[in-house]
Amino acid sequence: NFVSGGFNGQISVIGLPSGSTLKIIPVFSVHPENGYGFSEETKPMLETSHGFIPWDDQHHLALSQTNGEIDGRYLFANANNTPRVAKIDLKSFKTTEILEIPNSAGNHSSPFLTENTEYVVAGTRFAVPVDGEGDVPIESFKENFKGYLSFIGIGKEDGKMDITFQ
């Protein structure tokens, strides 16, 4: 069973029915035990448009699917503090990609997958200004702030994530 780590930014793999922790998968936080977030391979994944963010509030998980059935290729996780989605490869049980989502604040409502994992859908928790600069008077909230849904495309062959449309 995969369990969200919440504020520790990690995922726990829990054995059932024993409840034993089988593995900790670092995702949105540094993990000194195995060097995650310190190595040349993993440190860039914790870089955001706001700089190096070595922690996050990881909330929800979703397993990849084929024809609506779990296929065991990937596990996707959201970050609530800085709007990001991560992909964990279930062959290696390692985080292989983290994508920051533009025009979003508080990526709580994600990840939701289409039935063949063509898209991961992520919704912003809070409305954001649509001017591209994020600098508009609060008095203009009704006219200038919107909530976005982001559709993150998943490459069929390589599983690479990209913002396809919002």
Label for each model-derived stretch:
Residues 1-166:
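Predominantly soluble domains enriched in secretory-pathway, periplasmic, or organellar proteins
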